[in-house]
């Protein structure tokens, strides 16, 4: 979902930024009202933000972006979409600065998709499901929570697909065709992730209700009567899933998927619906449904769609079963991979020789490079900016080349995937290589698409290198001081500090619980894996909730007056550093003006 730095051209990144500012300002007003009415909710908000940070850091490559669980459904159900947009903004900023996920110019677009569209969909579905249920029970509550959590995930990626389609419409079919392509590529990973996230959040909700039902009562999500209805059902044990049930479930999934694909293919053969053929991009590894030799009749296309989708569903179920077998047979000689292996770049920034340089100066240096880089109409200036940033990071900031190269690998994979799609579907200009046509889509490389793909790739490289320089040289605590000097609302700064604190509380507690579960065989089977992981997430919620209450009590006992103490920034500005920054900005601005004049 994180659209990477430099991927959105003008004026789209400005449009989404302005729209995000309006939404976040409304959310901040709601946050201030919530904190004034219920001050005890601030630690819980920090907890929800940290939960979103952890879940949304589990990423898989996708076109110009990344696929991952969002975690926003949980926070949206608890606090509503307005407040959710605020802590999602904080999380996205932290991920850009701590992990270099996303970007600065694309921050507005990411906020709209992850912090506004997804939570809004989750809240609407949860409210509707809560109203239309025939009777309140653990089953109806679980179905409502599952639908809300899965919808938050899927709507987020639908909005991201729309943002990319508006920025890069297809040569044939325009925005709608491009939207279908992007959505199809996202769906490779996102549909299974949405289902898994929905199941995980349902298990978390049920576990929290069993341990701390007062949380839902205090937040006016459930009444005391409703929590009493849920409590007996929450304690029932689930029967184990046998091999035969796996086979039956797999057959049902394959039949349903194949039937749906056959139905969509049949609709796609009708007049005016040819764009539905783009569903073949859901699985890029299978044979595309086109027949240049006319060996397959048009009537067979629907069956081929069904066969392809059925094979894909069968492979998915079989892989899940193999994962179950592998988990059961895995020994303890090798350290298992966990979600907490992500390297927090803030550690590198604390040890950086440029740490003492003013955060204001580094912000000016990087933001100017990012904005000028994404504004450049030619790829040469962004490549020059990327080279300067790489030199500054490796030579001046003394960042390890191996670390820097590993950090750039994943963004370059994302950018390369997006550039490849732009290269093949944009069209325009003289045709260089003509590949094939699938329905309304003509896959070819033209002079215009080649220039646009090179420009997007160079802009992304410049933006990511600039963002990495800021991330690797500026601790997040220095940015808190900058926010305070910018006269940001104190509730926003306090919430940012709490989320930052809870991130490390989450990681520490999660590692301890995860290691204890491994020693007790908690991840021996696929069923135990899912159960243990959901219990881990729920226990993290409970423990951090309790720590949040303890923090609030300790703050109150120390005369907390609504303003957390923040140390002054120790950075300084030397004449040499200031001169170097301003000369660099003047140089790239002059080169930008020269490019504009040449065009």
UniProtKB/Swiss-Prot annotation:
Q: In which pathway does it act?
A: Cofactor biosynthesis; adenosylcobalamin biosynthesis
Q: Topology with regard to the membrane?
A: Multi-pass membrane protein
Compartment(s) where it occurs, according to its Swiss-Prot or TrEMBL record = Cell membrane
The terms describing its cellular component in GO are:
ATP-binding cassette (ABC) transporter complex
| Annotated GO MF terms | cobalt ion transmembrane transporter activity
| Renumbered residue ranges of the record's region CbiQ | 341-599
Q: Where is this region: CbiM?
A: 1-239
User: Which keywords does UniProt give here?
Assistant: Cell membrane, Cobalamin biosynthesis, Cobalt, Cobalt transport, Ion transport, Membrane, Transmembrane, Transmembrane helix, Transport
Give TM regions.
12-32, 44-64, 74-94, 106-126, 140-160, 162-182, 183-203, 247-267, 303-323, 356-376, 377-397, 407-427, 438-458, 463-483, 493-513, 579-599
For the biological process aspect of GO, one term held by this record is: cobalamin biosynthetic process
Question: What Pfam families does its record include?
Answer: CbiM, CbiQ
- Give the superkingdom in one word: Archaea
- What family is reported? In the N-terminal section; belongs to the CbiM family.
Listed under subunit, the entry gives: Forms an energy-coupling factor (ECF) transporter complex composed of an ATP-binding protein (A component, CbiO), a transmembrane protein (T component, CbiQ) and 2 possible substrate-capture proteins (S components, CbiM and CbiN) of unknown stoichimetry.
Classification via HAMAP family: CbiM (MF_01462)
What does this gene product do? Part of the energy-coupling factor (ECF) transporter complex CbiMNOQ involved in cobalt import.
Q: List the protein's name.
A: Putative fused cobalt transport protein CbiMQ
Q: Which species does the entry assign this protein to?
A: Methanocorpusculum labreanum (strain ATCC 43576 / DSM 4855 / Z)
Question: Lineage from the top down?
Answer: Archaea, Methanobacteriati, Methanobacteriota, Stenosarchaea group, Methanomicrobia
């Amino acid at each position: 979902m994180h659209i990477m730095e430099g991927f959105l051209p003008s004026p789209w990144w400005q449009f989404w930024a302005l729209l995000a500012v309006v939404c976040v300002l409304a959310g901040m007003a709601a946050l201030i009202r919530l904190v004034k009415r219920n001050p005890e909710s601030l630690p819980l908000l920090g907890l929800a933000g940290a939960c979103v940070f952890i879940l949304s850091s589990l990423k898989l490559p996708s076109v110009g972006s990344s696929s991952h669980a969002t975690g926003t459904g949980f926070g949206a159900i608890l606090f509503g979409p307005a407040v959710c947009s605020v802590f999602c903004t904080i999380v996205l900023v932290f991920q850009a600065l701590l992990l270099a996920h996303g970007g600065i110019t694309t921050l507005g677009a990411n906020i709209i998709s992850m912090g506004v569209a997804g939570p809004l969909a989750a809240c609407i579905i949860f409210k509707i499901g809560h109203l239309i249920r025939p009777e309140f029970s653990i089953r109806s509550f679980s179905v409502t929570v599952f639908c809300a959590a899965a919808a938050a995930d899927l709507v987020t990626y639908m909005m991201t697909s729309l943002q990319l389609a508006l920025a890069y419409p297809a040569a044939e079919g325009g925005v709608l065709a491009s939207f279908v392509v992007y959505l199809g590529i996202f769906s490779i990973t996102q549909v299974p992730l949405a289902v898994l996230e929905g199941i995980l959040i349902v298990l978390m909700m049920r576990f929290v209700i069993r341990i701390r039902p007062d949380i839902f009562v205090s937040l006016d999500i459930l009444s005391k009567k409703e929590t009493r209805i849920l409590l007996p059902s929450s304690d029932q044990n689930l029967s184990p899933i046998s091999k035969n049930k796996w086979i039956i479930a797999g057959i049902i999934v394959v039949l349903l998927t194949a039937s749906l694909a056959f139905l969509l293919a049949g609709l796609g053969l009708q007049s005016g619906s040819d764009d539905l053929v783009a569903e073949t991009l859901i699985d890029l590894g299978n044979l595309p449904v086109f027949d240049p030799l006319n060996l397959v009749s048009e009537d067979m296309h629907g069956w081929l769609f069904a066969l392809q989708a059925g094979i894909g569903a069968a492979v998915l179920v079989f892989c899940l079963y193999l994962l179950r077998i592998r988990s059961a047979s895995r020994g303890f000689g090798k350290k298992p991979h966990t979600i907490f292996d992500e390297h927090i770049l803030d550690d590198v920034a604390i040890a950086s020789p440029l740490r003492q340089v003013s955060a204001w100066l580094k912000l000016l240096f990087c933001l100017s490079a990012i904005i000028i880089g994404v504004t450049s109409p030619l790829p040469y200036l962004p490549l020059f900016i990327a080279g300067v940033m790489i030199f500054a990071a490796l030579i001046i900031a003394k960042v390890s080349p191996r670390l820097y190269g590993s950090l750039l690998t994943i963004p370059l994979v994302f950018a390369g995937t997006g550039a490849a799609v732009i290269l093949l579907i944009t069209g325009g200009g003289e045709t260089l290589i003509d590949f094939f046509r699938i329905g309304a889509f003509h896959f070819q490389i033209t002079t215009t698409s080649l220039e646009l793909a090179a420009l997007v790739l160079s802009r992304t490289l410049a933006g990511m290198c600039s963002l990495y320089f800021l991330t690797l040289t500026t601790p997040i605590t220095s940015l808190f001081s900058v926010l305070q000097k910018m006269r940001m609302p104190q509730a926003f700064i306090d919430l940012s500090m709490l989320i930052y604190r809870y991130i490390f509380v989450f990681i520490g507690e999660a590692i301890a619980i995860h290691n204890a579960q491994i020693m007790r065989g908690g991840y021996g089977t696929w069923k135990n894996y899912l159960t243990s992981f959901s219990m881990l997430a729920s226990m993290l919620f409970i423990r951090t909730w309790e720590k949040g209450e303890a923090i609030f009590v300790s703050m109150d006992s120390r005369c907390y007056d609504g303003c957390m103490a923040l140390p002054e920034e120790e950075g300084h500005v030397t004449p040499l550093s200031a001169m170097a920054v301003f000369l660099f900005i003047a140089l790239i601005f002059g080169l930008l003006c020269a490019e504009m004049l040449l065009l």
